[in-house]
């Protein structure tokens, strides 16, 4: 029985190390410049609203593209101008912080993330938790074959609020639709011979 328990512990530790997103060390100034900043994969970073110093740090990090999920307002236009001047590609695709995103919005963001010419990509909203958490959750389900529960757990770890019921519902709905679609496209089993 003890051997079985130690195997479970070893498997759990392995899963945490392999599946956990990379957390890059940050001092207080870096945290202020790039709040809630984390590496999701070699091609994708996530976080909150970067300052001008944060944009410079993204360039140093090798990021090529910023996808801003916040409103298209003066702040976004200033960020876009600053990002482009720093040599970054910039896209502002506003998502509501209070409503479910549409499938079209999600597809548009994922297409930007997946385009090789844009990678690595930094996706952000204000805090890097709710809208960004939803996008990253869908990315995880699509690219890393995560379940909705795994994706929501990571999103909650990075701050997806308990009040964000619509965002969490979207993650669950997306997963259900993904499963239904994969079941429809799966080849039928040949009839069994008797």
Question: Where are the language model's segments positioned?
Answer:
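Conserved lysine of the Walker
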Residues: 131
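Substrate/cofactor-recognition hotspot
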Residues: 128
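Cys-dependent protein tyrosine phosphatase-like superfamily
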Residues: 8, 14-122, 134-194
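N-terminal secretory signal peptides that target proteins for export/translocation
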Residues: 1-6
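Short cysteine clusters
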Residues: 125
């Amino acid at each position: 029985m003890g051997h079985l328990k130690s195997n479970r512990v070893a498997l759990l530790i392995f899963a945490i190390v392999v599946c956990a997103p990379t957390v890059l060390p940050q001092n207080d100034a870096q945290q202020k410049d790039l709040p809630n900043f984390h590496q999701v994969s070699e091609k994708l970073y996530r976080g909150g609203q970067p300052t001008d110093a944060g944009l410079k740090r993204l360039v140093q990090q090798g990021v090529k593209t910023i996808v801003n999920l916040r409103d298209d307002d003066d702040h976004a236009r200033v960020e876009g101008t600053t990002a482009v001047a720093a040599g970054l590609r910039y896209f502002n695709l506003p998502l509501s912080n209070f409503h479910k995103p549409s499938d079209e919005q999600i597809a548009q963001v994922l297409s930007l993330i997946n385009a090789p010419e844009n990678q690595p990509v930094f996706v952000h909203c204000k805090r890097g938790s709710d809208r960004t958490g939803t996008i990253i959750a869908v990315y995880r389900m699509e690219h890393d074959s995560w379940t909705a529960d795994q994706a929501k757990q990571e999103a909650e770890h990075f701050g997806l609020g308990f009040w964000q019921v619509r965002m969490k519902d979207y993650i669950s709905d997306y997963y259900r639709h993904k499963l239904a679609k994969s079941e429809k496209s799966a080849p039928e089993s040949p009839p069994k011979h008797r």
